[in-house]
Regions:
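Pan-zinc metallopeptidase signature
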Residues: 85, 257-337
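Bacterial signal peptide processing site
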Residues: 20-22
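C-terminal motif of bacterial Sec signal peptides marking the signal peptidase cleavage site
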Residues: 15-18
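Post-HExxH zinc-binding segment in Zn-dependent metallohydrolases
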Residues: 27-62, 213-259, 330
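Acidic/His-rich structured neighborhood in mature extracellular/periplasmic domains
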Residues: 101-244
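Sec-dependent N-terminal signal peptides
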Residues: 6-10
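Positively charged n-region of N-terminal signal peptides that target proteins for export
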Residues: 1-5
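Non-catalytic architectural context of zinc metalloproteases
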Residues: 24-131
Length: 337
C-alpha cells in the first residue's frame, strides 16, 4: 500500500474516533438538569427512614420553558405538608408557605432567579451519592450504639429563604435545603447526617429527664451530636471539625474564653422560658460558630476522659444534669484563672 493510502486510513480512523469521542462528550455535557433529576427516585426508604426528593419536582415543574403549578401542589406541597404549614409557614411567612397560592408563586420564580445555584448544588448532591451515604451512616450508628432512628421523614428541598439548612421541628418534619449557602452540600450529607441521626436517637431518651426543656438539655444534645460525629469518623476528622466545621482559630477562641463562656452560660442552664438565651449569649460575645455546640462537646469530652473511651454511650441514659456534674467540667472551670 502506498504511503498516501496509509496516511489517509490513519486520518479517517482518527477523524472517526475523534467524532465518536466528541459525540460522547457532547451527550454527557449536554445532559440537562431536567434529564438528571428525572432519574432521581421520588423517595428513598431505609429502615424507618424515608427521604423525599421534593427538589426533583421543584425543578421538573419548569421543564420545556413552562411552569406546571399542579405538579408543585401535588408533588411538593401535598407530599409533605407539615414542613410547609408547620415549619416554614410558622417560622417565616404563612401565606407564602402554608397556602397553595403562595407555594405556586415562589416556586414559579425560584428556578429563574437561582438557576445557576440550583444546578451547581443539585449536581453536587447527585455526585456525592446521597443514598449510599445514608446507608453508611445508618449502618454506622447501628454498629456504634446498637440503636436506630425511628419514624424519620426528611425532605430535600429548594427553599427561597435561608435559616434552617439542615434541621426541623420533629422527626417527621425535617428538611435539607439545598439552596442554603450557609451550608456546604457535601458536608451536610457526609457529616450532617450522622449528627442528625444522633439527635433522632438521643431525644426520645429525654422523655423522663426533669430538665428536658432547658438550655442545658439543648447544650448536651447538640454537643453529643457533635461528639457522636467525631466518634463516627474514628479519627478522620478533628474535634474542631466535628463541631460545625470549626477552624483551629475558632477552637482556640473558645479555649481562651472558656471560663467566661461557662460562667455566662451556667446561670441559664435551667431556664424554662420561651427564649433561647445561650444563642443570644453567643452573639453577644461574638463567639465563632454556635456557642452551645462547643460547650456541650466540651462537657462530654471531659466525661469521656474521666470514665473511659466507651463511656460516651452513657449519655443516652443519664439525665443532663448528671452528665454535667459527673464530667468534672465544673471543677475544671473553677480552677481556671
Amino acid at each position: 500500500m502506498k504511503k498516501t493510502g496509509i496516511t489517509l486510513i490513519i486520518f479517517l480512523c482518527t477523524f472517526i474516533f475523534s467524532c465518536n469521542e466528541k459525540t460522547r462528550d457532547k451527550s454527557v455535557k449536554e445532559l440537562s438538569i431536567f434529564e438528571k433529576v428525572e432519574s432521581v427516585p421520588d423517595s428513598i426508604k431505609v429502615d424507618d427512614i424515608i427521604i423525599y426528593n421534593l427538589f426533583k419536582y421543584q425543578i421538573l415543574a419548569h421543564k420545556n420553558d413552562s411552569f406546571d403549578s399542579i405538579m408543585i401542589i401535588d408533588k411538593v406541597y401535598n407530599k409533605q405538608p407539615k414542613i410547609w404549614k408547620e415549619l416554614y409557614g410558622v417560622l417565616f411567612d404563612h401565606d407564602m408557605f402554608a397556602t397553595e397560592k403562595g407555594m405556586v408563586k415562589w416556586n414559579k420564580e425560584i428556578f429563574r432567579n437561582k438557576k445557576d445555584s440550583i444546578k451547581s448544588r443539585v449536581n453536587t448532591l447527585l455526585d456525592c451519592k446521597f443514598d449510599s451515604t445514608l446507608n453508611a451512616s445508618l449502618a454506622g450508628i447501628k454498629k456504634l450504639t446498637g440503636r436506630t432512628p425511628k419514624n424519620i421523614r426528611l425532605s430535600i428541598i429548594l427553599a427561597p429563604v435561608e435559616g434552617i439548612g439542615f434541621g426541623g421541628m420533629e422527626n417527621d418534619a425535617f428538611i435539607l435545603d439545598l439552596l442554603d449557602n450557609n451550608f456546604d452540600v457535601i458536608n451536610m450529607v457526609e457529616e450532617g447526617i450522622p449528627h442528625e441521626f444522633n439527635h433522632f436517637i438521643y431525644e426520645p431518651t429525654r422523655e423522663n429527664d426533669p430538665n428536658k426543656n432547658t438550655p442545658l438539655r439543648l447544650t448536651i444534645d447538640e454537643g453529643f451530636a457533635c461528639y457522636y460525629t467525631y466518634k463516627y469518623f474514628d479519627g478522620k476528622i478533628s474535634k474542631s471539625e466535628a463541631v460545625e466545621q470549626m477552624t483551629d482559630d475558632d477552637w482556640n477562641w473558645y479555649l481562651q474564653h472558656e471560663k467566661e463562656v461557662y460562667n455566662k452560660c451556667s446561670p441559664y442552664f435551667f431556664y424554662e422560658g420561651d427564649e433561647d438565651p445561650l444563642r443570644g449569649l453567643g452573639r453577644e460575645m461574638n463567639a465563632p460558630k454556635t456557642l452551645l455546640y462547643w460547650l456541650g462537646f466540651r462537657i462530654i469530652d471531659f466525661y469521656v476522659n474521666k470514665y473511659g473511651p466507651d463511656s460516651w454511650k452513657d449519655i443516652y441514659n443519664l439525665p443532663v444534669n448528671e452528665v454535667l456534674e459527673k464530667s468534672g467540667y465544673i471543677q475544671y472551670i473553677d480552677e481556671l484563672k
